């Protein structure tokens, strides 16, 4: 493990992550001020449906290219590196295009039957066109991560966020009087255009970069062997999360008698409180992505002592940092909710969820470690248990206790997942 390069990459990714999260938080504040809490609920549900197709489009290809590139570089096989990238790009283009067609064709049904209003149809159609760009750029980013080159990915993300913010601001000031459906479509159009810009940048950068002559295609089934467990985990996890997100406003409505209130409280939680809670986690997200090639490298060389050392240090850093962050939210949660969103509800949610911040952050790191160790099946098991239990508890408790019942469900499920991670042995 090259400690200097790993540290440099971690610093670069962390700085990029902080900028992106700060910009993203600013963007959410802007959108929340325009759409309101109920509108944020519909905005969150729109992206819940969209994320289902994002998962279908990505299908673990980015993880596959990262692991294959890291493995072949460790074994000094440059032709195999180029072949792995080509094969994964082909898969990414096919999957992204297929997911785009499915979402575009089914947007009317999904908006009316799943979200509950046809006002979201145009937004879903607009988001569909971002899927091919997203899958290809994700594959290219995974390639560079496998090479321990994080700079291209960082630049593309900064460029993407800058374009997104500029276009959302333009939409807010130009189509504010066009009605909710038009406003929502204009806001998500920024997402589609920014994904296209990011993909174009990465494609040009990769094209201009010398890669040598010759390419050896990866062994038959090698991409599927890595991607399918990751994809299966994400398919199931996303399907369960989609069910959970659709169920929450309905369950709150049964408690309060108002679906509008259910949407408003759901929007406050998923669209405001949770993004703010994960704002400081930029370093951990950077660490998680960098751990995949590092752990893949050491395990490919059967250097289990180095692997265990990486895992132990990653977990120690995660626990230390997350406990401090949780303390800040516990003390200043209500103030932060008032400052950013002028909402007492958001402040209450931050305060309640602050003690489980270490458990939520730990899940991020564990995911990267397990992918690097080729133990995606464990991630699938943990996610399945967690999401299934949450859905059952939501159906049982939220109709009787409202949003406070769901916050209790979140606390319980995160503690359960953390206990499963704690019992895992590398």
List where the protein language model places each region.
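Residue-level signature of transmembrane alpha-helical cores of multipass secondary-active transporters
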Residues: 13-17, 51, 92, 126-127, ...
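Short runs within selected transmembrane alpha-helices of multi-pass transporters and secretion channels
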Residues: 20, 62-63, 126-145, 153-161, ...
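Membrane-water interface segments that mark the loop-to-transmembrane alpha-helix transition
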Residues: 63-108, 122, 305-325
């Amino acid at each position: 493990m090259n400690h200097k390069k790993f540290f440099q990459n971690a610093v670069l990714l962390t700085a990029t992550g902080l900028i992106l999260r700060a910009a993203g938080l600013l963007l959410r504040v802007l959108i929340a001020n325009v759409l309101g809490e109920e509108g944020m609920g519909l905005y969150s549900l729109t992206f819940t449906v969209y994320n289902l197709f994002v998962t279908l489009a990505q299908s673990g290809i980015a993880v596959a290219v990262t692991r294959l590139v890291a493995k072949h570089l460790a074994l000094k096989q440059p032709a195999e590196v180029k072949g792995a990238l080509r094969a994964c790009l082909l898969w990414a283009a096919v999957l992204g295009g297929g997911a785009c067609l499915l979402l575009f064709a089914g947007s009317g049904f999904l908006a009316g039957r799943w979200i509950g209003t046809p006002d979201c149809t145009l937004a879903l159609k607009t988001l569909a066109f971002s899927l091919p760009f997203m899958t290809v750029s994700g594959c290219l980013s995974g390639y560079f991560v496998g090479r321990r080159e994080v700079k291209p990915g960082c630049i593309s993300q900064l460029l993407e966020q800058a374009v997104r913010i500029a276009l959302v601001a333009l939409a807010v000031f130009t189509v504010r009087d066009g009605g909710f459906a038009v406003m929502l479509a204009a806001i998500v159009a920024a997402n589609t255009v920014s994904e296209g810009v990011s993909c174009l940048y990465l494609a040009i950068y990769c094209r201009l970069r010398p890669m040598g002559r010759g390419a050896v295609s990866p062994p038959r089934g090698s991409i599927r062997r890595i991607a399918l467990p990751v994809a299966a985990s994400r398919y199931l996890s996303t399907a369960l999360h989609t069910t959970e997100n659709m169920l929450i406003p309905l369950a709150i409505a049964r408690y309060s008698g108002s679906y509008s209130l259910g949407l408003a409280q759901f929007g406050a939680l998923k669209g405001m409180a949770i993004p703010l809670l994960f704002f400081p986690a930029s370093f951990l997200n950077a660490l998680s992505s960098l751990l995949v090639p590092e752990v893949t490298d050491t395990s490919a060389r059967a250097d289990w002592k180095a692997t265990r050392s990486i895992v132990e240090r990653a977990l120690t850093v995660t626990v230390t940092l997350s406990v401090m962050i949780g303390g800040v939210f516990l003390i200043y949660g209500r103030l932060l909710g008032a400052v950013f969103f002028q909402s007492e509800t958001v402040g209450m949610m931050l305060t309640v969820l602050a003690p489980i911040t270490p458990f939520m952050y730990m899940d991020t790191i564990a995911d990267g470690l397990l992918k690097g160790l080729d133990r995606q099946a464990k991630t699938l098991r943990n996610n399945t248990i967690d999401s299934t239990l949450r859905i059952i508890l939501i159906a049982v408790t939220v109709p009787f206790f409202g949003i406070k019942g769901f916050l209790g469900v979140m606390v319980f499920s995160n503690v359960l997942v953390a206990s499963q991670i704690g019992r895992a042995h590398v």
